[in-house]
Amino acid sequence: MGDTLKRRIQHFVKGQMCQTERSVVQEAPLRLTVNGRELATLVASPHQLNFLVAGFLRNQGFVDTMDDILCLGTCQEFGVANVRLAREIPAQLVPTLTSGCGTGISFNLADTELRPLQQQDVCYPATAVFAMMQDLNRRTEQYRSHGGIHSAAVGDNSGLLLYAEDLGRHNTFDRIAGEALFRDLDLAGKMLVTSGRVSTEMVAKAVRLGIVLIASRTSPTNMSIEMCEAAGISLIGYQRGDSFELYSHPERIVAAPDPGKIHGVTGVILAGGGSLRMQSDKSLLPLQGARFIDHVHGVLDELFEE
């Protein structure tokens, strides 16, 4: 995405100092002005700033649809963003300093933390959660090359829908919310996977967008667990490999069947016909005047041509 720069550095290893080149993450401030009023300065990776700004305003509750945004302009070179909204923002805003990288800001944390979700009946198989995290890991090229970049994605049982990278984990979700706004995508009932820690500001943003499941490679905070429990969100932490820890609303996760037990004819074929319980080879049992395995082969011959 062009968010890195090459720098000459000194590398100390095994008692020796040598010069080398290293990729470093770009960090850029963005001064946000809304309706002529300077609202905040966002510190973020310098790409797709329109998504970041729109998502930030959406997650703060200032906009709901693109119709609420009359004009939005950003300038990466000068680090400014100017927005004209159809409605005025509140005159008195009480900012909350969040636990995000570089200390994020939220204006609506208390307003969203206990608002229940509408789509409570949405369920996800564990395999879909694993597949989403694997897709996220494959896309996170910057993190593998030099670290310092967070990533997040939103999707459903059909797969990944939106993906974002940023040096701030809270910014990744703002970017996703903004892109969904531009593309008119409804995120209600979707799941969010993230590389970063799940804290209260992340949950508050998820509640506002109708996200029903959040999964992270790392740990959640105690307040985020309580917020997810109250809002009806399934919260997953420490998702690594083929395991995860589920902190709230386990009823939404459908466990995968035991891959070691396949029942019926398919199980007999794949198991080689052996039966520990019967102490015999089931494929050799008589069926319609022939062996069971011969009958299976005959059926398969009728179904599939050479």
Which residues are covered by each model-predicted region?
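Feature captures the catalytic cores and cofactor-binding loops of soluble hydro-lyases/lyases
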Residues: 170-246, 255
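Intrinsically disordered, low-complexity regions enriched in acidic/Ser/Thr/Pro/Gln residues
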Residues: 1-157, 162-163
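Nucleotide and nucleotide-moiety/phosphate-recognizing core
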Residues: 261-306
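A charged, well-structured terminal subsegment
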Residues: 248-260
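Conserved hydrophobic helix-helix packing surfaces used for dimerization/oligomerization
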Residues: 152, 192, 265-267
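Short beta-strand-to-turn element immediately C-terminal to the catalytic PLP-Schiff-base lysine
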Residues: 155, 247-249, 286-287
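N-terminal-biased segments
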Residues: 137, 148-186, 256-257
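Solvent-exposed alpha-helices and their adjacent loops that cap or buttress functional pockets
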Residues: 22-25, 74-75, 142-147, 153-155, ...
